[in-house]
Amino acid sequence: MTMLVVAIGNPGRQYTWTRHNIGFLCADRLLQEFSGVHFKETPKLFSDIAKVESSQGTVIFIKPRTYVNLSGKAVLAVKEYYNIATDRILVLADDVNQPFGKVRLRQSAGGGGHKGIKSITQSLGSNDYWQLRLGVGRPQREDVELSDFVLGQFTEEEQIGIQSLFIEAWALFSQWCSGTQTA
């Protein structure tokens, strides 16, 4: 069985350590558990792609190169190319509605205002995929726009705390792969 893990984020070094790219960072961390596997640029599928074989089947990781708000274009291209069922897709996305460090696994969920999730749902014509929502919290100050916040760099405290988030993400990812998760 083939599974697809979609990391939501923006391509480019300037975005690497931003809250909106926590999906990319999480995918990189998950992939480290499979030694010797790296992302390769795949222009025809609008993504960087890595494939791993696990005891549960093939897992394809993608980091779309379309920017967050257009993630659906890449997801649909990869889904169709590899003939992956929608319910075998897991999307790793930042979540401003969860406190920093909280990780939540859900299926057939709404987007919570996330434009990348909205793009994926529109492109697939369904929300029957799984979401691993990675809490990044909200701005502490009212004068900070939400868009500036998610495109902002992690604080030193968040950079330290992100490791715990990745540990929780690995546990939920493993459950999802094995089919033992609960929505």
UniProtKB/Swiss-Prot annotation:
Active site: H20
Record Pfam families: Pept_tRNA_hydro
Record-linked Gene3D superfamilies: Peptidyl-tRNA hydrolase
GO molecular function: peptidyl-tRNA hydrolase activity; tRNA binding
Site positions for Stabilizes the basic form of H active site to accept a proton: D94
Cellular-component GO terms for this entry: cytoplasm
Keywords, alphabetical: Cytoplasm, Hydrolase, RNA-binding, tRNA-binding
Domain of life: Bacteria
Positions with a binding annotation for tRNA: Y15, Y67, N69
Annotated site location: Discriminates between blocked and unblocked aminoacyl-tRNA: N10
Location of this chain's protein in the cell: Cytoplasm
Main subcellular localisation: cytoplasm
EC number: 3.1.1.29
Record-level GO BP terms: protein quality control for misfolded or incompletely synthesized proteins; rescue of stalled ribosome
Reaction catalysis annotation: an N-acyl-L-alpha-aminoacyl-tRNA + H2O = an N-acyl-L-amino acid + a tRNA + H(+)
Family membership: Belongs to the PTH family.
Subunit and partners: Monomer.
General function of this protein: Hydrolyzes ribosome-free peptidyl-tRNAs (with 1 or more amino acids incorporated), which drop off the ribosome during protein synthesis, or as a result of ribosome stalling.
PANTHER family found in the cross-reference section: PEPTIDYL-TRNA HYDROLASE
HAMAP family: Pept_tRNA_hydro_bact (MF_00083)
Annotated protein name in UniProt: Peptidyl-tRNA hydrolase
Native species: Chlamydia felis (strain Fe/C-56)
Organism lineage: Bacteria, Pseudomonadati, Chlamydiota, Chlamydiia, Chlamydiales
